[in-house]
Amino acid sequence: MAPKKAKKKVEGGSNVFSMFEQTQIQEFKEAFTIMDQNRDGFIDKADLRDTFAALGRLNVKNEELEDMVKEAPGPINFTVFLTMFGEKLKGTDPEETILNAFKIFDPEGKGHIKADYIKEMLMTQEGRFSQEEINQMFAAFPPDVSGNLDYKNLCYVITHGEEKD
């Protein structure tokens, strides 16, 4: 009788499921299910194209889709999908580090910075942001009616992936 073999580990060694809380894993599973348009258990170029189309972006180039798929070490099943997000998030600075960086521009400790000022800083200092990156940030985190950016909430979302209740 041959001994039973354990399931092969995904590249990277450690258990990717231990990197996330159960609620986060469920959210990733929902995202994976939405992206797996043909419901075959894998995300491929066709799934990505259909996902972009569903989001209103119809002019995605083949090369862009190929580059996205090439980021994975092989076929993208849910475990690989989760591992890829884990690797991307592993390099994310802790919330306190990001907050401290914003606090440099907020000496009075108000918790917000003028959006125009932060835009200027991000586009002119080392590690410059592009106009497109600035637009994406302000689309996701629009300034308030006074033109201020709530950087405390922004930091929370960057590090936790969701807004505070």
Swiss-Prot record:
Ca(2+) binds at residues 36, 38, 40, 47. Signal peptide: none annotated. One of its GO terms (molecular function) is calcium ion binding. Pfam families: EF-hand_6. Keywords: Calcium, Metal-binding, Methylation, Motor protein, Muscle protein, Myosin, Repeat. InterPro entries: EF-hand-dom_pair, EF_Hand_1_Ca_BS, EF_hand_dom, Myosin_RLC. The keyword Calcium applies. GO terms for cellular component: cytoplasm; mitochondrion; myosin complex. It comes from the Eukaryota. The modification N,N,N-trimethylalanine is found at residue 2. Residues 23-58, 93-128, 129-164 form the EF-hand domain. The N-terminus is blocked. N,N,N-trimethylalanine, found in other myosin light chains would not have been detected in the N-terminal tryptic peptide in PubMed:7319048 because it would remain trimethylated and ninhydrin negative after hydrolysis. SMART domains: EFh (SM00054). This chain binds calcium. Myosin is a hexamer of 2 heavy chains and 4 light chains. This is Myosin regulatory light chain 2B, cardiac muscle isoform.
